[in-house]
Regions:
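Non-catalytic signal-transmission and effector/linker regions of two-component phosphorelay proteins
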Residues: 1-3
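Conserved beta-strand positions in the Rossmann-like core of class I SAM-dependent methyltransferases
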Residues: 5, 30-31
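Active-site residues of response regulator receiver
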Residues: 8, 54
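Two-component/phosphorelay signaling modules centered on CheY-like receiver
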Residues: 11-30
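Helix N-cap/capping motif at the beta->alpha junctions
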Residues: 32-41
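Conserved phosphotransfer cores of two-component systems
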Residues: 42-46
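Proline-aspartate-enriched helix->loop->beta-strand connector
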Residues: 47-52
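Receiver (REC) domain active-site loop signature in two-component systems and cognate sites
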Residues: 57
Length: 58
């Protein structure tokens, strides 16, 4: 199972990524974050295999 962290400041974009990933039973969504600081904490805590990161957050 692959652990994933999703980091995006737009709730709609985050929920869309979650919706797509939930269709794959081999993927575990370890954390959803709305800013970079939360994202770094989640990455350190969960050690994900994949990170979905919005590269332009306000």
């Amino acid at each position: 199972m692959s652990k994933v962290v999703i980091i995006d400041d737009e709730p709609l974009a985050r929920s869309l990524v979650v919706e797509y990933l939930q269709q794959h039973p081999s993927i575990e969504i370890a954390a959803e974050c709305n800013d970079g600081f939360q994202g770094v904490k989640a990455i350190m805590q969960h050690k994900p295999d994949l990170i979905f990161l919005d590269i332009q957050m306000l």
